[in-house]
Amino acid sequence: MSINMIKALKVRLYPTEAQKVLLEKHFGSNRFIWNHFLNARTTYYAESKAKGKPQGLNYFKTAKLLTELKQDEKYAWLYEISNSSLQQTLRKLDNAFTAFFRKNSSYPNFRSRKGNQYFIVPDNARCEGNKLVIPKFIEGIGYRDKSTIPEDIKQVIITRDVNRYYASILYESTEEYKKGTGTVGIDMGIKAFLTASDGIQIEPLNAFRKKEKRLAREQRRLSGKKKGSNNRRKQKVKIQKIHQQIRDARTDFNHKVSTAIAKHYGTVVIEDLNIQGMQKNHSIAKSVTDQGWNQFRAMLTYKMKWRNADLIEIGTFEPSSKMCSNCGNIKHDLKLSDRTYHCEICNHTMDRDLNASINILNMGIIKIGEGIPEFTPVESATAAELSKGGLRVATL
């Protein structure tokens, strides 16, 4: 089917040294505006509440205050910064307060220099050749990407990750996506990143585990460097680059897996995992964090939506692991170390994760009021695409 959607294309930027200085000024100025008006809104509300008439500052009031702020000689440096990006920071702050008052989010936090650095360009962005043109960068910032950047750009988010600069370009797209066929239940795990009810099992990437020894070595070297020294700063960058490599590898892995699943299945049933609860278990906390399940879930959600496919969620506390997928018996003494599920009632024996994924599938089908399907063999096209992407795939 053909649908209209807002898509994002992330490209790496290659700014000149002068442009890097201006980009850093944009990061710092937008961070300053966020913190300044977060403090202003908090103070204004507290003072008005003390007077018995609690009131808040909205976007329009803060926009007016920003204009007044720029007229103060102390803040004349704000004129070097794209005004539209500063306005967008005020809008984002206003949205954060709206989410808080609707109880959808916690109270907005102050931004730190050590946090994610970004600013938003809401309009007036375009591409000229191999350069991205945004306000205050009329000469264009160089980029390299195989993808063609569309003309109808809705918004650009400029970010820095360690020493790399990126532009996330949001644009409207009308594309044809074919809905997959078949229904599958998916069990997320640590021994196997994913086990599907049709027998596909994907080994985990374990991006952090692969870099763990090197990371520990570089962190030991950091502890030996003098605080405030140039060598310590360089060592910090080394460590940040390792974390960057881990994030990049995990993102690439999750994209490949989520794309293959969304492409080949029309209905996917998953379990709503209590990831925060699992991270409190010290024996598996590091492995749970290393999987990147939240990122995978987010990717799968929007890719299924593109295809008008169904993503069904079952509850966290459903007995998917302890239930026999053949007779429904609950095995209360099942241990985490038990990799094979054996039912004493019907003598059914199966891989533990495959048994759980079949239960997840059945629970999802019952939830939407359809009959339980029969077990289907591995779809060869799905397994082939996953293997082609460099992933380690097994069939059960």
Positions of predicted regions on the chain:
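Substrate-contacting helices/loops that form the catalytic groove of nucleic-acid
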Residues: 46-75, 153-155, 161-184, 188-297, ...
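Acidic carboxylate diad motif detector
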Residues: 59-161
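Short acidic-glycine loop/turn motifs at beta-strand connectors
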Residues: 128, 161-162, 197-200, 327, ...
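Short polybasic amphipathic segments
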Residues: 125-126, 130-136, 192-196, 339-342
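Secondary-structure transition/turn motif
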Residues: 131-141, 169-174, 199-200, 347
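Gly/serine-rich nucleotide phosphate-binding loop at the start of the catalytic core
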Residues: 1-86
